[in-house]
Amino acid sequence: MRISRGRESGPSEQRGPTFTGRVWADPVLKAEDSVGVNNVFFEPGARTHWHRHEVAQVLHVIGGQGWLQTRAGDGGPLTAGDTAHIPGGEEHWHGAAPDSYMAHLAISVGANDWLDPVSDEDYAAAFRGR
């Protein structure tokens, strides 16, 4: 067992090639035993690329509004207080709404497999008619 106190896990990092738009991650717990825990902050319109996790991912939204979408077409809005479980192997993306930031706590278990970017058309379609 280990308890991580305060900011011992490192400074905020701006994320790059596996995201569209500006995204920052704040390591909450230094990754170990294939478990990563990060606070992630998306500016309006920012999002992950399509990706999947070896075991699973849990997202808990702490502020703003966003979206979670699977490659199979399932998805929906995310708002503060929502928690989502994404099973291992399920291709998905998540990010902020076009007109709102989104912040979530991400708990990822197992390796991440980063795939292609979410097109602007697919991103816009997710929010059409919401």
Residue ranges and their predicted role:
Residues 48-50, 68-69, 91-98:
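Short beta-strand His + acidic residue motifs that chelate non-heme Fe in jelly-roll/DSBH
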Residues 58, 85, 99-117:
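A short hydrophobic beta-strand segment most commonly corresponding to one strand
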Residues 72-89:
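Short acidic-glycine-tyrosine-enriched beta hairpin
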Residues 1-35, 114-130:
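A short, N-terminal "cap"/entry segment at the start of jelly-roll beta-barrel domains
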Residues 54-66, 71-72:
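Glycine- and acidic-residue-biased ligand/ion/polar-headgroup-sensing regions
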Residues 38-53, 88:
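Conserved short histidine dyad/triad with adjacent acidic residue
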